[in-house]
Amino acid sequence: MVNRRIAEILRSGQPDESLVVQGWVRTKRELKGFAFIEVNDGSSLGNLQVVINQDLPDYAVIVKQLNTGASVEVNGVLVASQGKGQRIELKAEAVKVYGEADPETYPLQKKRHSFEFLRTIGHLRSRTNSFGAVFRVRNACSAAIHQFFQERGFLWVHTPIITASDCEGAGELFSVTSLDLKQIPRTENQGIDYSQDFFAKPTYLTVSGQLEAEVMAMAFSNVYTFGPTFRAENSNTSRHLAEFWMVEPEMAFCDLEGDMDLAEAFLKHIFNHVLEKCPEDMEFFNQRIDNTVLATAENIINNQFERLTYTDAIKLLEKADVKFEYPVSWGLDLQSEHERYLAEQLFKKPVIVTDYPAQIKAFYMRLSDDEKTVRAMDVLAPKIGEIIGGSQREERLDVLERRVLAQGMQPEDLWWYLDLRRYGTVPHAGFGLGFERLVQFITGMGNIRDVIPFPRTPQNAEF
């Protein structure tokens, strides 16, 4: 017999097909002479109903084992369903129970559990409808990212997890060391003697693959990274993770206009792909989590993003008939409430803000001719605020050296990055997208800890 995934069976299975299904029991109902179980294998939101007649060998023993959470293999034949709610069902000819789940102790029963409770059983929460849908959408987003860039001739490059550089200059880094923490070697002035460490210098978990991606773009023109990044930011909020995934394309011979065009096309592609591949899951989110997710997706796909400068954005915010918690003034960074006002209330669609003050942006962003602003851009989305941050990079060696020094960094630490401007420099641009924030935005999930399988947050590193 053919082993089939339940998603495929529900989509195209026909009566009289003989097949094998493997999965986990979601529910059981016993009636006189037979039992119904609903089996799910993670491939779809929907379950496959299995009918077990009492003439099955060891019927009573098997049915007693088929509690919620038990793992099973069912051999049988598809038949047209007599009941409502499903087109077909599986008439069991043989049932094998791989593993039982004691109903007295198994924490997932047939009721809705709060997300707070499910975070306490992270090893089991993927078996619920909500988290099954989240991680199928997360998978579809991942596939869409690779599809988008590969179709456009980008090279996927693997940038290092362990690095000696702080791309953002924020200092919120996790240190990597093999030194004995009980007996840390010291220099004469009582600093840490890194010469005895594994890499003979201070090293950290990466906060971004951007600088290394720029290296590769100077050889392959268009590249992208997609991998984990780390921030030792002690923020216990619904928007922050210590370990999260980033998508970072870099394009040689590209300016800010090209960067914005790519970012807009990129977001539209991902939303289109998810709606095509996960319609059932997206409908679930729209009904159970946030009744605007489908409308939001259509908004992203069907609207041209609004583009305006930071200076114009500040003027609009100053005129707004809204009392903001944080001040609005030229030279201050936009807060989430400002970003959401622009995207949600004013323009009612995604907004790209460009040309931010140089003093609030990173050293590598291209200085504008006025020397007050840089060629930066942020994509602001309704309901979430900033979803993408990017810029045209500074390709002029003398200007970049000035910017490095102005931000208190040492040029010798970035000698290799400066070399890119010495040998065959070109205008280039790129952006970064926080993957979990994207999944959160698409699904409507309220807490970022619920869109990654194993969240890493302050005081929490389970599994």
Curated annotation (Swiss-Prot):
CDD domains: AsxRS_core, EcAsnRS_like_N
Enzyme Commission number, as recorded: 6.1.1.22
GO molecular function, one term: nucleic acid binding
Disulfide bonds: none
Single GO cellular component term: cytoplasm
UniProt superkingdom: Bacteria
Annotated Gene3D superfamilies: Bira Bifunctional Protein, Domain 2, Nucleic acid-binding proteins
Presence of keyword Protein biosynthesis: yes
The entry's keywords: Aminoacyl-tRNA synthetase, ATP-binding, Cytoplasm, Ligase, Nucleotide-binding, Protein biosynthesis
Short name of any one Pfam family annotated for the protein: tRNA_anti-codon
Reactions performed catalytically: tRNA(Asn) + L-asparagine + ATP = L-asparaginyl-tRNA(Asn) + AMP + diphosphate + H(+)
UniProt keyword Protein biosynthesis present: yes
InterPro entries reported in the protein's UniProt record: Aa-tRNA-synt_II, aa-tRNA-synth_II, aa-tRNA-synth_II/BPL/LPL, Asn-tRNA-ligase, Asp/Asn-tRNA-synth_IIb, NA-bd_OB-fold, NA-bd_OB_tRNA
The protein's assembly and partners: Homodimer.
Family affiliation: Belongs to the class-II aminoacyl-tRNA synthetase family.
Record protein name field: Asparagine--tRNA ligase
Source species taxonomy: Bacteria, Bacillati, Cyanobacteriota, Cyanophyceae, Nostocales
Gene that this polypeptide is encoded by: asnS
